[in-house]
UniProtKB/Swiss-Prot annotation:
Annotated glycan sites: 32, 74, 348
GO molecular function: transmembrane transporter activity
GO biological process, one term: transmembrane transport
Principal place of residence: membrane
Protein's name according to its UniProt entry: MFS-type efflux pump MMF1
Segments for region (Disordered): 1-74
Source organism per UniProt: Mycosarcoma maydis
Free-text disruption phenotype from the record: Impairs the secretion of mannosylerythritol lipids (MELs).
Length: 619
């Protein structure tokens, strides 16, 4: 009816809603003036012009529920309180981030046991890792778009369900092929988990706080980095499928908590805008390009020579595809009107440098974490569990240094000096590790890991705040998704390049001995997976193989030294931007409140959906 408006009151945090008829007088009464601002005063001119006659309009009250103790909302200036609601969401996000990070690196320690328990296959063992990383990288921009289209809750929950399905496939796999497929499904969900955790935390925290909370996230990754080889070693010695079964109870608990408590309202989009946000063409080109590059670097030097067409053709196609992707994203066109990587993300010098440093940090962190257990198993005759314990000096310093860096950013709002310190420690630590050999002493391998771990820990929480400080709030989702993509893309190159250098060098230097080694199971395809079995080789061939492995591992570490130096010098190109103490996000956390039927002022904290007939010409 023209003289009656139908008002739906949605109680945040609950799936049910109810409707009541409200007269125009009630909506405009003085008692409710603060709770329900007169429509359409809360809409911009552009919003008014895009409204349809039936469109539901979300009206946000001027006096909103506080979300944190010490921050002000960037629009209303209201004090925000982090109550139990917030901490439940935060805890659930940290749990699923932990299991996703765990599965990213835990497989490296258990790889020899998995290889020994599955039927022989022509699939290279490092594809178990690559199959996880490829969809993980490609899915992060997609979930960034989904978070705007279907909302934060269903994006993160969808990613979690996909990850758990992949875990079941991996745990029940009886062949290498099925295991690789399961890892691919896991990676698809894992990419969404990583991207959405950072987007949601950016919604709920201020730029100043973000250093602290991302320090906690870094702590989670550091704990996962230490726990992964330990758990991988334990499970590989008893039952390797539990590497994947362990994800189910943790994931199920988190899923229930997020369904109940996570209710973040994002700006309304039309159906067309939602599709545009997904950027299907751009994401398809990116996925194909990353796939081609990963095939080339994974198979190069192992299954085929680097000069073979089977390697350089996909490599060239992948690099050309990346160039095409950038053209699609950066040149205005109808194919990608709302690109996942808009050009303005990289027009700001500070943001661009931070993205480069995020990539380099991902390369070094994941490459080193993957290679260190191989050194201890192959050279020092350690079991998977023992190699994890001997890797503790690398992970242990990451805990306090990540948290310390986050706290310092939160207190001072400064980050450049910390970044300089992080790169210096990383360069010193990895430089020392290039001198590891068969006879390296405990002091040398332990202390060099401590130095590197401190630098890696410092860098975890401090590259995202300058990115978000340099860009407008409207770019938060795309900027954060690009950050997650950049770091994981670095992980792909770090793990793949390190294992490729190691495998190529070891295979090349072992070929003269293959007449003795092939009957024992060592070949170009099994160089990485065979590391645990070196201690079972007869003398003197065991000493020869250990020397070759030690040199190959040292060669892989040399890759990271110039990267750390580059990271240090790029810091001079950053500006020390202020980190304001307000929430820089267009999304809002909805909290459960009591709503009275009379719509008194106590209902000011509710989210009201007003469905009304909108005149064709709005004032």
């Amino acid at each position: 009816m023209a003289d009656e408006k139908r008002t739906s009151i949605e109680e945040p945090g609950t799936p049910m809603s109810y409707s009541t008829a409200a007269s125009p007088e009630l909506l405009s009464s003085s008692n409710n003036a603060s709770a329900l601002p007169a429509y359409p005063s809360s809409q911009t001119k552009q919003d008014k012009e895009s409204l349809s006659h039936d469109q539901a309009v979300r009206v946000e009250p001027e006096s909103s529920t506080p979300l944190t103790d010490s921050v002000e909302d960037n629009e209303s200036g209201a004090k925000v309180k982090k109550d139990l609601h917030f901490w439940i969401i935060f805890s659930a996000l940290m749990l699923i981030a932990f299991v996703a990070a765990l599965d990213m690196t835990m497989i490296s320690t258990a790889l020899p046991a998995i290889t020994a328990n599955l039927p022989p296959s022509t699939i290279a063992a490092n594809w178990i890792t690559s199959a996880f990383l490829l969809p993980m990288v490609a899915s992060q921009p997609i979930f960034g778009g989904l978070s705007c289209s279907i909302g934060r809750k269903w994006s993160i929950n969808s990613a979690l369900v996909i990850f758990l399905v992949g875990s079941v496939v991996c745990a029940t796999a009886k062949t290498f092929l099925v295991l690789v497929i399961g890892r691919g499904i896991q990676g698809l969900g894992g990419g969404g988990i990583h991207s959405m955790c950072e987007i949601i935390m950016s919604d709920l925290t201020t730029l100043r706080e973000r250093g602290l909370f991302f320090g906690v996230i870094a702590l989670v990754f550091a704990v996962a980095g230490f726990a992964a080889p330990v758990l991988g070693g334990v499970f590989s010695e008893h039952s390797w499928p539990w590497i994947f079964w362990i994800n189910l109870p943790i994931g199920a608990i988190s899923l229930v908590l997020l369904i109940i408590f996570l209710n973040i309202r994002v700006p309304l989009l039309t159906g067309k805008e939602k599709w545009q946000k997904l950027d299907l063409v751009g994401n398809a080109v990116l996925f194909g390009s990353v796939t081609a590059i990963l095939i080339a670097v994974t198979e190069g030097g192992i299954k085929y020579r680097w000069s073979a067409w089977q390697i350089w053709v996909p490599l060239v196609v992948g690099l050309l595809g990346i160039m095409l992707f950038l053209v699609i994203e950066w040149v205005p066109n109808r194919i990608a009107p709302k690109p996942v990587f808009p050009l303005d993300l990289f027009r700001n010098r500070t943001a661009s440098v931070a993205y480069v440093q995020t990539f380099v940090h991902g390369v070094i962190f994941y490459g080193v974490i993957y290679m260190v257990p191989i050194y201890f198993q192959a050279i020092k005759d350690r079991t998977p569990l023992q190699s994890a314990i001997w890797s503790f000096p690398l992970s242990a310093p990451s805990f306090p240094f990540a948290m310390g860096a986050g706290v310092l950013i939160s207190i001072t709002g400064k980050y450049k000096l910390l970044i300089f310190c992080g790169w210096m420690l990383m360069a010193a630590g990895i430089g020392w590790m290039t001198h590891w050999h068969v006879g390296t002493s405990k002091f040398e391998w332990a202390f060099s890991q401590v130095i590197l771990g401190a630098g890696l820990g410092i860098m975890f929480p401090i590259t995202l705040p300058p990115i978000q400080a340099a860009l407008p709030a409207s770019r938060l989702e795309s900027a954060t998704a690009a950050y997650a993509f950049t770091r994981t893309f670095g992980a792909v190159w770090g793990i793949t390049a390190a294992t490729t250098i190691f495998s190529t060098q070891a295979a090349k230097n072992l070929r003269p001995y293959y007449d003795q080694l092939n009957p024992l199971g060592l070949s170009d395809f099994t160089v990485v997976a065979f590391s645990e079995q070196l201690r079972n080789l007869p003398q003197p061939i065991q000493g020869v193989v250990k020397g070759v492995y030690a040199d190959a591992i040292s060669d892989s570490y040399w890759l990271f030294v110039p990267l750390a130096i580059i990271g240090f010098f790029t810091t001079f190109g950053m500006k020390e931007l202020p980190l304001p103490d307000f929430i820089k996000s267009e999304a809002k956390l909805e909290q459960k409140q009591d709503v009275t039927p009379a719509l008194k002022s106590s209902a000011a904290h509710a989210v009201v959906n007003v469905k009304t007939e909108v005149p064709s010409t709005l004032p």
